[in-house]
Design a protein with these regions (language model features):
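Thiamine diphosphate
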Residues: 142, 146-149, 154-257
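N-terminal amphipathic/basic-hydrophobic helices that include classical n-h-c signal peptides
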Residues: 1-27
Length: 305
């Protein structure tokens, strides 16, 4: 048994999928959870997001962590052809967290899925921690790319998708960007290249929570009509409620069946989703819960649907 299989979380030391088959064919996720199971994982991830950020000595990005939670849970517990025992498998799907400031949510997801021990979450952003404030693949199992400087994830994802195509690999490359991040021109240069090479193994997900550090994205650097922009750059465009697991599952699985062009999902989310006093509040971009806020947030997240 590998060391990774001993970690706590939903993985539960099982190297096989719920269908009882080893991971050899296309579209084999380690869990293949249904929507209700994914929602429960998202709830548990959100609880850890609150405690992780509250204990951080260097702040955090609570709002961004919470807006992306349903997307991450859907990817890791249903969509990605990978699992915690396959982090060195050359045929695994690759997930890149381009919005690196939201890594707290990703760490909580990785812990829940068994990639890292849940005990590590208490060391988030502490000195010499294995969980730094932005993704570092040399420190954290399951992290595929060092990010944080916005606009870098998609260009690298395009390169990985092209390399996979040239080598005959069936792997898919997924990348999550923020909507504010799309003001970076490097994203659009990469998008042009993805369309030129017809990279239908590339899946971009935009966490469109409409807020960034300084306020409303629509006021700082308007993006809309975002669907028209992506289509003009040669992408097949999908949209859904990015905090609705049923919609995420349906849309992402439908996207996997399309061929001939790179894909983008515009996921309409609420920054801070799941905690009423954090939702849609720009000040929570770089705020963490303290004192009574922690218990109040956890109380709201005590029960699933």
């Amino acid at each position: 048994m590998s060391a990774l299989n001993k970690y706590s979380g939903a993985y539960q030391n099982n190297k096989y999928s719920p269908r009882g088959q080893p991971h050899r064919s296309r579209s084999m996720n380690a869990f293949r959870y249904d929507a209700q199971q994914i929602k429960e994982q998202a709830r548990l991830i959100r609880r850890n997001v609150i405690t992780l950020n509250a204990a951080s000595p260097a702040g955090g990005h609570t709002g961004a962590d919470l807006s992306e939670t349903d997307i991450l849970a859907t990817l890791y517990f249903r969509i990605l052809d990978t699992g915690p025992e396959r982090i060195e498998d050359p045929e695994r799907d690759i997930y890149i967290q381009s919005k690196g400031h939201g890594v707290g949510g990703l760490y909580c997801c990785l812990a829940q899925a068994g990639y890292i021990p849940e005990a590590w979450l208490a060391d988030y952003q502490h000195f010499n921690s294995r969980l730094p404030g932005h993704p570092v693949r040399q420190k954290t199992p399951g992290i595929e790319l060092n990010t944080g400087a916005l606009g870098h994830g998609l260009p690298v994802a395009v390169g990985l998708a092209l390399a996979a195509r040239m080598s005959g690999s069936n792997k898919r490359i997924y990348v999550l960007t923020g909507d504010g991040e799309l003001a970076e021109g490097s994203n659009w240069e990469a998008a042009m290249a993805a369309a030129k090479y017809g990279l239908d193994n590339l899946f971009v997900i935009v966490d469109k929570n409409k807020l960034q550090l300084a306020g409303l994205t629509a006021e700082i650097m308007p993006l809309d009509p975002l669907d028209v922009k992506w289509a003009a750059f040669g992408f097949a465009v999908s949209e859904c409620d990015g905090n609705d697991v049923e919609q995420l599952v349906s849309t992402l699985e439908q996207m996997q069946t399309r061929k001939g062009a790179p894909q983008v999902l515009i996921a309409h989310t609420i920054k801070g989703k799941g905690v009423s006093f954090i939702e849609a509040r720009p000040e929570w971009h770089h705020r963490v819960p303290k004192g009574d806020e922690v218990s109040a947030a956890l109380e709201e997240l005590n029960h699933g649907e």
